[in-house]
From Swiss-Prot:
Cellular component GO terms held in the UniProt record: plasma membrane; proton-transporting ATP synthase complex
Keywords: ATP synthesis, Cell membrane, CF(1), Hydrogen ion transport, Ion transport, Membrane, Transport
Subunit structure: F-type ATPases have 2 components, F(1) - the catalytic core - and F(0) - the membrane proton channel. F(1) has five subunits: alpha(3), beta(3), gamma(1), delta(1), epsilon(1). F(0) has three main subunits: a(1), b(2) and c(10-14). The alpha and beta chains form an alternating ring which encloses part of the gamma chain. F(1) is attached to F(0) by a central stalk formed by the gamma and epsilon chains, while a peripheral stalk is formed by the delta and b chains.
Principal cellular location given in the protein's record: membrane
Name of protein: ATP synthase subunit delta
Membrane topology: Peripheral membrane protein
Length: 179
């Protein structure tokens, strides 16, 4: 529902990062802030607490992050607090990462297998996907025993499902239809 808004915030920050030649630094800083927020119950409680004023929340964030992140990132965080969007920072980070990939002619491919891919399999998959999408492929591998066997690949909205679990489900559906 708020993807468009997340994208706009991310694009604004990305443009500032580009102007300052600090895209990698900003991405790294945002990841660190997201991890700190996710792993700190106290920060989450403060951000969610209705009786703590916005100005107090901004003061707390300034105290925590002043010397840890770039001033422009801190300003971005304070705007998100003001607009009550700080709890959705991770979504903005994901959008910023997508923008980074787009601008660098790259695309993320999520791959699920039961066992890790061999080096040759990984290289072949990257090559084939690169040819199909005409972009540099960033492979994100995940081990998932529930697929039983085969490989599942998601690139953007495209899904290539060659898993044994899906084949078995399809066979089961066909058998139930015949009864």
């Amino acid at each position: 529902m708020y993807e468009y808004l997340d994208r706009r915030y991310a694009l604004a920050l990305y443009e500032v990062a580009e102007e300052n030649n600090k895209v990698d630094e900003y991405l790294r800083d945002l990841k660190e802030v997201v991890n700190i927020i996710k792993n700190s119950e106290d920060i989450c409680k403060i951000l969610k607490h209705p009786e703590i004023s916005t100005s107090r929340k901004k003061e707390i964030f300034t105290e925590i992050f002043k010397d840890k992140v770039d001033d422009k990132i801190l300003s971005f965080l304070l705007v998100l607090i003001e607009k009550e969007r700080i709890l959705y920072l991770e979504e903005k980070l994901k959008e910023m990462e997508k923008i980074y990939l787009e601008k660098n002619n790259m695309i993320l491919a999520n791959v699920k297998t039961v066992i890790p891919l061999l080096k040759e399999e990984r290289e072949e998959l990257i090559e084939k996907l690169g040819n199909k999408y005409n972009k540099k492929i960033i492979l994100e591998e995940e081990i998932d025993k529930s697929i039983i066997g085969g490989v599942y690949v998601r690139v953007g909205d495209d899904v290539l499902d060659g898993t044994l679990s899906t084949r078995l489900k399809d066979i089961k559906k066909m058998m139930l239809k015949r009864e």
